[in-house]
């Protein structure tokens, strides 16, 4: 069940997604939170603008992937297993695998892979990999989402990204 604290972290992830969009990247944001509800690390999509805003495009700079990498280098096995990743969009297959290989815990997301695929179809946008859900990649992982009230905002970000036409969000 998604709690009020979960929603707070998801709102931060959505804010990071908006930051990514404003910077010129696809709108995705993620937050890594410890078992005692402390925000450990945040990131946004940087696939176009580069790790340091240097413009060196890197298709692996998804926020879920960079948080998994950060956690692997900075947290113990136990800390990683007890952590939660909050994200504006369900992990892709690459990020799901990184999450599992690094031994991270629960994932809570705003919009699902299924939703993203429907939105992409609406605008004729493709993807280079199969649209797998997290649990298709990591069957035993605890995953919660989508969160419809926030997914509407994320949808608007994607529309703006794909069309260049912004919609005014009330959230």
What are these regions (language model features)?
Residues 77-89:
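Immediate flanking context of iron-sulfur cluster ligation sites
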Residues 39-49:
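Short beta->alpha transition motifs characteristic of CBS
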Residues 34, 61-64, 146:
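A structural motif shared across PLP-dependent enzymes of the aminotransferase-like
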